[in-house]
Amino acid sequence: MKKTENILASSVDTDALVSPDTIIDAQSGSLVDLKSSEPIRPFKVKFDDAELIDLRQRILATRWPKRETVNDATQGVQLTTIQKLAKYWANDYDWRKVEAKLNSYPNFVTKIDGLDIHFIHVRSKHANALPIIITHGWPGSVIEQLKIVEPLTDPTAHGGIIEEAFHVVIPSLPGFGFSEQPSEGGWEPNRIARAWITLMKRLGYNRYVAQGGDWGDAVTELMGVMAPSELQAIHTNLPATVPDEILGALWTHQPAPATLSPDEKKAWDQIDFFFKKGLAYAQQMGSRPQTLYGIEDSPIGLAAWILDHDARSYELIARTFDDKKEGLSKDDILDNITLYWLTKTAISSARLYWENKVVFFKQLGVKIPVAVSAFPDEIYQAPKSWAEKAYPKLIHYNRLEVGGHFAAWEQHRLFTKEMRAAFRSIR
């Protein structure tokens, strides 16, 4: 992968949300923190043809197992599903389309805490737009957020109003995508949260909000716990709201308390299902990530591992290859998988589970304003009662009818509406 310095950001105007200690670099268009000695360097996504040829040859050379002995996905990704994916990937898929899409936005890298961090930074043309940093999870990437960049930065062209505009910052997690892979331990969600605070300070934003789901939620909520004065509020689509007594009962396989409301019982059942049927991927990556050499060496191995994220998300991801109605296209799915392959980040991204010290879904004690969008096909749909206890300053809660783990990706129009509503009260 070659790094070049010929990508130009759109011209922008300074506004009240930008620190006086920053300037706009004439070459890159990015904000530069005058107090920081670390430069913000333009970045271009570019892979050689030889890498794409090698990918195709590896797909075609796959050694296939016999089909599963059941007629469903209870044993894992079904052979017919992954073979349909392989056929499309090898014969019809075009990486250059998403590469061009990525390069249509200003991309940058900057060194934070010894690591080169990649991020997309798109500033709105509208004055007083609200800066937002949006963090992906696993098995996601910055590709998850591409569909919401233009609606957020240019709301008047996408059914919104000027007052709903955002300046958008989308970083790649360390060891993911185009960010540098850590060569030593210690890059866990707390450290990443501190790095994101540094990034927003380096970009010169003295007032901003943050959003995340999956690992992005952990990072975003920890930013909320750290509560730098610049961070006004956060939004999450996979909130950490489960009360300690409920979480303890679920971990120890106790029966559901009789006092749960219908919404709480639904959440209980979803988490119980996830702990019993959907946690294997996280347990493997959390205990022995380096053992997963197969997903680093085989594109089909990587694709199957990503498809089988968890049983509930598997339905959302894999159904496009099973000729079912879907919100994600075949290209959507393969854009993301191919990014993992070309950047060689299958194992480096898995190590985040090994590094992690945050308990899944456990309340973290965020005291700043929080907005929650609860999607029905998420790992669990957080009840409002739990959200109110977890977040004393809950400024927005909406229980959606459609959408799941990849909400911004699969339901980008609905997700955009949620972003506009979530932060309306703090602008």
Predicted regions and their residues:
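Conserved acidic catalytic loop of the alpha/beta-hydrolase fold
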Residues: 190-208
